[in-house]
Amino acid sequence: MIRDMAISTITLGGLLTGCMASSILVAAEFERQTVLAVLCKPVSRVYFILGKYLGILAATCLLVFSQGLVLEVALIIRNYGTFQNGVTNLSSMIDFVCILGICFSLLQILILTAISLVLSLYLNTIANLTICLFFFIFCNTFSYILPLHSLRHEGVNILTAVCYAVFPNFQTLNMVVINDVVAATSSPWQTSNIAQYIVYGSVHSAIYCTAVVWLAVFLFKRKEIA
């Protein structure tokens, strides 16, 4: 329970940092017209967007990793205190679920920061953060709001399938699902299932994040800056 709450807090902090940084920094470039000075130099718009995005991610990842390291050390100390007979095997004390939770938190941050970057091209900070908040809530709950049932009308099934394709399912990246997958009965099939779960979550998040960043570059290339 403590581990799950700590990872959720780290995730929310990282999401807030990434979204606020992208919404404030990029929007401020347009408000102060400093983007014109940057683009007058031999810097393409692609590199401008990628530089902003990667810089924000570097700072956010450093924050999340440092907090995750503190949490993991605290869990190792707690596990060491619960073991008897002076167990010295470090691998038995490392909380791999915590590490996986931190990594999947970063995947959520990657996606939502990219969404915020796109919105920052046209919206101010308050509108940007508001949309990101509703986007995050919807992506964590739409598997309940839009359940896929075979008995539904075909048109409704198509609509819900489109929603599953357009919106990332953050619920598959949170600690509830991670605990369900890891805590299942140990077997060769379960080990393979965990590996598939990690690969699927990572690949899907990477593809979605790449598509959103490409959209940001596409829109920024066509944006008139006066």
Where are these predicted regions, by residue range?
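Membrane-helix interface/capping residues of multi-pass secondary transporters
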Residues: 34, 45, 125-126, 225
